[in-house]
Amino acid sequence: MPKSSRSLSALPSQTAKPLESLGLRLRAHRVHRAWTVAEMAERLMCSPNTLRALESGKPGTSIGLLAHALWLLGQIDSLDGVAPAPAELAAKRRVRRSAAQGAAGVIAEGERDF
């Protein structure tokens, strides 16, 4: 009996449409490489039905499977563009620490809670 998830079945169209679009792009990359569903599924170590679900944009497929598929298709770098950090966070990462702040990753004696 297939698993069901109330939260996955109630996805808003604003969420479902990008997943479907992503699935179609994955399929296009697979077809461009002239791989059959069976060949790609074997490379992904999943069933052909699971690959079809991924290519259909089904929300229940694993994000790990998606990452593996992107890697196989030479598209793993595109995953870096998903949910980029807000500009404020990126700017804070570029700020250098002063000597008074201490080295990154070092907890001052007074800040330790153990």
What spans do the regions from the language model cover?
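Short basic helix-loop element that most often maps to the first helix and adjoining turn
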Residues: 24-39, 100-104
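Short alpha-helical DNA-recognition segment
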Residues: 34-52
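Short, basic-rich loop-to-helix N-cap that marks the start of a DNA-contacting helix
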Residues: 57-71
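N-terminal flexible/basic segments that precede or flank functional cores
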Residues: 1-18, 79-82, 86-114
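Short acidic/histidine-centered micro-motifs embedded in hydrophobic/aromatic stretches
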Residues: 43, 69, 82-86
